[in-house]
């Protein structure tokens, strides 16, 4: 019924050697599926990429054919530099922003505003349970907004609408399903959440 989509994924590319990475990427291309991996999560990871491949992570992924898959998703992308943001902009590459996990693991603050400005689809995720302690998407939305403000040192940055878009249509675009879900439109699936606003915890709404 179209509710299940299968992607190929390596949680971290370092969990496989180069041959294994290549096989996984080739599998995604062969079967026409998306490919997902965690990348540029920690600063030490970037250093390891440069040691192994002689270049930053996104450029190493380009050499492996990661961007030639039908759709590629990168979780975290905390340590992307401007050249990497430019590289993935305009390609079928998206980012899963995991703000609470990035705080818990002291990974850093992802340059989300730069990615959005470059037109890169960004959705909001939670990462795994041990990296987060819960799967509360409303908490993720709040923290995404707060971290965006802290990153830019601007209280007006990453406002509620920016975060709501990432949590809805942004996430749908990130997985290539924005034609089906992510916004309330005629012909789309009724992917709707109702929230009570008449409770103390929802004040000032």
Residue ranges of predicted features:
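His/Asp/Glu-enriched, well-ordered alpha-helical/loop segment
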Residues: 63-69, 113-199
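Short glycine-/small-residue-rich Rossmann-like dinucleotide-binding loops
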Residues: 78, 99-100, 198
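Short, surface-exposed loop/helix-turn segments at secondary-structure junctions
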Residues: 200-205
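Histidine/acidic residue-rich metal-binding segments in metalloenzymes
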Residues: 1-94, 106-122, 139-142, 179
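Residue-level marker of alpha-helix boundaries and capping positions
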Residues: 14-15, 75, 102-103, 158-159, ...
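Short, acidic/turn-prone active-site loops that include or flank metal/cofactor-
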Residues: 41, 99-103, 128-130
